[in-house]
């Protein structure tokens, strides 16, 4: 179920503070965060945020299309390596 509109989006306060600091800077640094549940707001557009996926921080450049989504959606936690090509069940003749 989506969050109520009157409550507003969930955004980590420390993340907002870091973005406000870099708002007017020319050289924007990558902001590291562990807050995967934070909602992307229009303030985030143009920043690069490194989102933790359980192993490493994956840098994500925020665009206008991402507004309203969660940061964790752009940092996959599981790696898919494909199915075994030499599977004996498939090669039955």
UniProtKB/Swiss-Prot annotation:
GO terms for biological process: ribosomal small subunit assembly; translation. Residues 73-93 are annotated as: Disordered. Pfam families: Ribosomal_S19. NCBIfam families: rpsS_bact. Protein S19 forms a complex with S13 that binds strongly to the 16S ribosomal RNA. Belongs to the universal ribosomal protein uS19 family. This is Small ribosomal subunit protein uS19.
């Amino acid at each position: 179920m989506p969050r109520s509109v009157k409550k507003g989006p969930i955004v980590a306060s420390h993340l907002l503070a870091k973005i406000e600091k870099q708002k007017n800077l020319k050289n924007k640094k990558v902001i590291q965060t562990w807050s995967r549940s934070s909602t992307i707001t229009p303030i985030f557009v143009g920043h690069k945020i490194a989102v933790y996926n359980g192993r490493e921080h994956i840098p994500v450049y925020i665009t206008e299309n991402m507004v309203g989504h969660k940061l964790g959606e752009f940092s996959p936690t599981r790696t898919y390596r494909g199915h075994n090509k030499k599977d004996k069940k498939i090669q039955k003749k």
